[in-house]
């Protein structure tokens, strides 16, 4: 038996494997609310311009509301035989209200319908992710304010480089997530055009009002080219690109949490809420939440790569390949949402060991740059010469297994005779961070000010997410 939604020219139904590979209801059921919203706007417009009667439009709208209630309550039965969410909804509508349901699809194709539904879903998801990113920024800024003066090592090449503060380190991620929010908002602004009314690819001969449906659905305007309207998936690619970058930021932070929680670092501790044990080693406390955030970044990046490969060879306009646009996007953006929730919880939960971090900050000659700067400022040495002198002093200290601050003044003067006792003021890690007063630097006063600025800005954001 052929599919009654499209099977008029077919003498028989599809093969079982064709049904299996063709059906998308197993994942596009997630578009149900967007599909119903689009259909309600469409039928209201059809009635306004006189294409369907007011009575039919009212019956269709009432039926769509009933279907929405069934889906929300869990009473709706999704049918694989009906392929996708669009045909599942339309079939149920016909069962509820009869022949009038057949008028809903006037001047519309599944091509513009799915493009609309997916845009609405991505837009809703961006709004939700933006709210989660804001929550993570707040948690980071609050913790940064609390630990604005807690000294820790700053690293380059995973080697101790210069002392920074824990608060400063956390604020670096606040900045990263701000850029992620900006990218998602940019993607949202570009996707906010309605493809509804483009029909299959060429538009329609019916006197529809695309501007009316665009307004009703919260879009800025209708799309301007019907071919592009049904074949465009840039809005998904751009959103996945922004999501992948955000996932990379989360993964980098997760990696640091994993390192910090090792006995070898011992910089921070996650509570039992975000740790697990071993089935064989009773002493273990594994930072599994952070490891899973790190791992899920690969899924988000993979979804972006996968969709790029799907789209790269498609001529205009719609091809069935484009059904593969959704499953990866659903998974990737859900994974990102989980990661944001987990990371926000870990940030609130994490307990830094400030004494251990401070001790580590003083190891590895992390104040060598401060010494070089002092030689420039106090003695007038060119920086390259100061760099060379400092290197010789580090070598002298290292040969004796001492810190720079443990060298005697006479030992320093053996390298550079003009060094005086004032040098010792810059060799402590707390003095080092206090001196970094340049804009964006790690001085605790700077960090406190930046944390307050972020907390104020985030608190002042309007209640609506975008």
Swiss-Prot record:
Keywords: Amino-acid biosynthesis, Arginine biosynthesis, Cytoplasm, Lyase. Transmembrane segments: none annotated. It catalyses: 2-(N(omega)-L-arginino)succinate = fumarate + L-arginine. It is an enzyme of class 4 (lyase). GO terms for biological process: arginine biosynthetic process via ornithine; L-arginine biosynthetic process. It comes from the Bacteria. It is found in: Cytoplasm. GO terms for molecular function: argininosuccinate lyase activity. Pfam families: ASL_C2, Lyase_1. NCBIfam families: argH (TIGR00838). HAMAP family: Arg_succ_lyase (MF_00006). Belongs to the lyase 1 family. Argininosuccinate lyase subfamily. This is Argininosuccinate lyase.
């Amino acid at each position: 038996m052929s599919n009654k939604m499209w099977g008029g020219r077919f003498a028989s139904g599809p093969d079982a494997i064709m049904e299996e590979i063709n059906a998308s209801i197993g994942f596009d059921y997630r578009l149900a609310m967007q599909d119903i919203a689009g259909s309600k706007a469409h039928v209201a417009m059809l009635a306004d311009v006189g294409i369907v009667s007011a009575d039919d439009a009212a019956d269709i709208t009432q039926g769509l509301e009933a279907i929405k209630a069934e889906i929300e309550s869990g009473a709706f039965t999704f049918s694989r035989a009906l392929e996708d969410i669009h045909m599942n909804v339309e079939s149920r509508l016909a069962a509820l209200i009869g022949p009038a349901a057949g008028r809903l699809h006037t001047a519309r194709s599944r091509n513009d319908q799915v493009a609309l539904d997916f845009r609405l879903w991505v837009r809703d998801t961006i709004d939700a992710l933006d709210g989660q990113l804001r929550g993570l920024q707040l948690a980071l800024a609050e913790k940064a304010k609390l630990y604005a003066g807690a000294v820790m090592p700053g690293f380059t090449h995973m080697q101790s480089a210069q002392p920074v503060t824990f608060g400063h380190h956390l604020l670096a991620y606040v900045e990263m997530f701000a850029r992620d929010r900006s990218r998602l908002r940019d993607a949202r602004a570009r996707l906010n055009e309605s493809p509804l009314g483009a029909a299959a690819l060429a538009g329609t001969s019916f006197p529809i009002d695309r501007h009316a449906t665009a307004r009703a659905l919260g879009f800025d305007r209708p799309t301007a080219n019907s071919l592009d309207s049904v074949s465009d998936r840039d809005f998904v690619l751009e959103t996945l690109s922004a999501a992948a970058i955000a996932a990379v930021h989360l993964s980098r932070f997760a990696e640091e949490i994993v390192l910090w929680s090792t006995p070898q670092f011992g910089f921070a501790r996650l509570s039992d809420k975000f740790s697990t044990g071993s089935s064989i080693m009773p002493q273990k406390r594994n930072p599994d939440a952070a490891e899973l955030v790190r791992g899920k970044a690969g899924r988000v990046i993979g979804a972006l790569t996968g969709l790029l490969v799907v789209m790269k060879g498609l001529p205009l306009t719609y091809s069935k390949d484009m059904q593969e646009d959704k499953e990866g996007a659903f998974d990737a953006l859900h994974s990102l949402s989980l990661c944001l929730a987990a990371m926000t919880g870990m940030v609130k939960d994490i307990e830094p060991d400030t004494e251990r971090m401070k001790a580590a900050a003083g190891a590895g000659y992390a104040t060598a740059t401060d010494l070089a700067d002092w030689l420039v400022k106090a003695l007038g040495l060119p920086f390259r010469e100061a760099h060379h002198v400092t290197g010789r002093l580090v070598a002298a200290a290292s040969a004796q297994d001492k810190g720079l601050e443990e060298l005697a003044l006479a030992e320093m003067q053996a390298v550079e005779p003009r060094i005086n006792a004032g040098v010792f003021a810059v060799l402590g890690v707390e003095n080092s961070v206090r001196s970094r007063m340049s804009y964006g630097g790690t001085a605790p006063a700077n960090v406190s000010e930046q944390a307050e600025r972020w907390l104020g800005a985030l608190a002042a954001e309007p209640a609506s997410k975008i």
